[in-house]
Curated annotation (Swiss-Prot):
Single GO MF annotation: 8-oxo-7,8-dihydroguanine DNA N-glycosylase activity
Function (record text): Involved in base excision repair of DNA damaged by oxidation or by mutagenic agents. Acts as a DNA glycosylase that recognizes and removes damaged bases. Has a preference for oxidized purines, such as 7,8-dihydro-8-oxoguanine (8-oxoG). Has AP (apurinic/apyrimidinic) lyase activity and introduces nicks in the DNA strand. Cleaves the DNA backbone by beta-delta elimination to generate a single-strand break at the site of the removed base with both 3'- and 5'-phosphates.
Cofactor note: Binds 1 zinc ion per subunit.
Active site, renumbered: 2-3, 61, 278
Quaternary structure and interacting proteins, as annotated: Monomer.
Name of the featured protein: Formamidopyrimidine-DNA glycosylase
Presence of keyword Translocase: no
Residues that, per the record, bind DNA: 102, 122, 168
Xref: CDD domains: EcFpg-like_N
Obligatory cofactor(s): Zn(2+)
Reaction equations catalysed: Hydrolysis of DNA containing ring-opened 7-methylguanine residues, releasing 2,6-diamino-4-hydroxy-5-(N-methyl)formamidopyrimidine; 2'-deoxyribonucleotide-(2'-deoxyribose 5'-phosphate)-2'-deoxyribonucleotide-DNA = a 3'-end 2'-deoxyribonucleotide-(2,3-dehydro-2,3-deoxyribose 5'-phosphate)-DNA + a 5'-end 5'-phospho-2'-deoxyribonucleoside-DNA + H(+)
Classification of source organism: Bacteria, Bacillati, Actinomycetota, Actinomycetes, Pseudonocardiales
GN (gene name): mutM
InterPro entries assigned to the protein according to its UniProt record, in alphabetical order: DNA_glyclase/AP_lyase_DNA-bd, Formamido-pyr_DNA_Glyclase, FPG_cat, MutM-like_N-ter, Ribosomal_uS13-like_H2TH, Znf_DNA_glyclase/AP_lyase, Znf_FPG/IleRS
């Protein structure tokens, strides 16, 4: 699933190519891709026609397109919320480009320029039209209101996140993946941040010192910024930017997906452990198992 850096790459592409344009038509080719829009596909398409996409924003793994224009009775505080799921893609394509095999939703614009296409092989992702609400002075889609700011947001409070993490009674990786604590971090960047901070994934959060928790969250910021510079992490063609190009941060991963290969820091073979129906990767020497692990 795309994590913060991948979604931010897509957001920047959408902002560059789509923001400021007015929707002329929306074509929903697969109703499952707008299943979270309860009034249904026809309502989704009808309410977007004539609306201007005024901004592209993101929190964690969610991005949204703020809307302006439309009839006077339309609430201006609305947005198209996008969640990419496992395989969702937002592509900017010229009108004459052939339809992708898994094209689900198409946006056409009144300037006759490139389309915005939502492509999703597994249909776990989706789009919905939702109201914006204010959370601590920031306008976010109502379905996203419960998640915490992510580490790349200006409103992210590092010291507050450190304090919240140390109050949890859980394992440190579980805490990193908890989107109500810090949003945007998934399996890949959690493992990479833990490696950089030299912490085992099952270390109890209650046993973290304040400097350790701070070091870990700073490591998460640093690794995600590095991934963003590299265009994100692509293991297959399911994650691409708006131009259909893959990221290349997978070449820089220290431990994630590197089981049996030498740790870049000490040379010890990287270990893979089962974790929450997925995997955790760590260096047994740099990240020793704690005395009282929280699995």
């Amino acid at each position: 699933m795309p994590e913060l850096p991948e979604v931010e790459v897509v957001r920047r592409g959408v902002a560059a190519h789509v923001v400021g344009r007015t929707v002329s038509e929306v074509e929903v080719l697969h109703p499952r891709s707008v299943r979270r829009h309860v009034p249904g596909p026809d309502d989704f398409a009808t309410r977007l026609a004539g609306r201007c996409l005024t901004a592209a924003r993101r929190r964690g793994k969610y991005m949204w397109l703020e809307l302006g224009g439309g009839p006077e009775e339309v609430d201006a505080g609305e947005a198209v919320l996008a969640h990419l799921g496992m395989s969702g893609q937002l592509l900017v394509q010229p009108d004459e480009a052939p339809d992708e095999t898994h094209l689900r939703v198409r946006f056409r614009f009144d300037d006759g320029g490139p389309q915005l296409r939502f492509v999703d092989q597994r249909t776990f992702g989706g789009l919905s039209l939702t109201e914006l609400v204010s959370v601590d002075g920031v306008a976010v889609p109502e379905p996203v209101a419960h998640i915490a700011p992510d580490p790349l947001e200006p409103v992210f409070d590092l010291e507050a996140a450190v304090a919240r993490m140390r109050k949890r009674r859980t394992g440190v990786k579980r805490a990193l993946l908890d989107q109500t604590l810090v949003s945007g971090i998934g399996n890949i960047y959690a493992d990479e941040a833990l490696w950089r901070a030299k912490l085992h994934w099952a270390r109890p959060t209650a046993n973290l010192t304040r400097p350790q928790a701070r070091t870990l969250l700073v490591a998460a910021v640093e690794v995600m910024q590095a991934a963003l510079t590299a265009g994100g992490t692509s293991f297959d063609d399911l994650y691409v930017n708006v131009n259909g190009e893959s990221g290349y941060f997978d070449r820089s991963l220290a431990v994630y997906g590197q089981a049996g290969l030498p740790c870049p820091r000490c040379g010890t073979p990287v270990r893979r452990d089962a974790f929450m129906n997925r995997s955790s990767y760590s260096c047994p020497r740099c990240q020793p198992t704690p005395r009282n692990p929280h699995y």
